[in-house]
Amino acid sequence: LACCKPAEQPTVDAARYRSFWLWAGVKPQPVLKTAKSVYVLEAQIDDGPHGPRWVQQRAATPRTAGPEIWLVLRVHTLIWSTAIERQLRARLAAWRSAGNRVVGLQIDFDARTRHLDGYAAFLKRLRAKLPQDTKLGITGLLDWSANGDPDQLAAISGSVDEVVLQVYQGRQTIPGYQGYLAQLKRMKQPFKIGLVQGGEWKEPAALKSNPWFRGYVVFL
């Protein structure tokens, strides 16, 4: 019967990578000691009954010597107040004052493929309000590569320094991810691929030869 079992699919071994997401409540792993970049969840921006709310995800500001740090905001509304913008600038300054090498801000927002124009406008406004030494990055959905409007994707690219396309939901790789990745030739902007630790993953042969591909980020 053993010969009838389906072949096991290769999975993501975090030790083979150097860039990671670290969410609140997730215990740091040894792979972080050799990390080049760490994307740290700092806060959520929620749509509260009286306007947007900054929901802090970390009680203290750690000091991490070595890797580049991207602060991540998990965003549920694109309507921000001046108070939210002030809080963002204050947190960027606090992390830097603690001795961290903060290089950028990443927005984690589930922008629907059919509404990327509104997201592009938001990112353009946000870009203008960030300190000049702070990069702007975003996460993206796999569907963008297959069905995203090229002009809207170009507008987004004009405001951000990097896009990380996530091939997972929760703790599982998205079924059929290979079909979406086959459409990456439509992407004319620099991108990374976001993987989940332990999730199924087999690198497409064409990916590394794609001139826009910039590497991986692994969700721990």
What are these regions (language model features)?
Residues 3-220:
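Secreted glycan hydrolases and related glycan-binding modules that recognize and/or cleave
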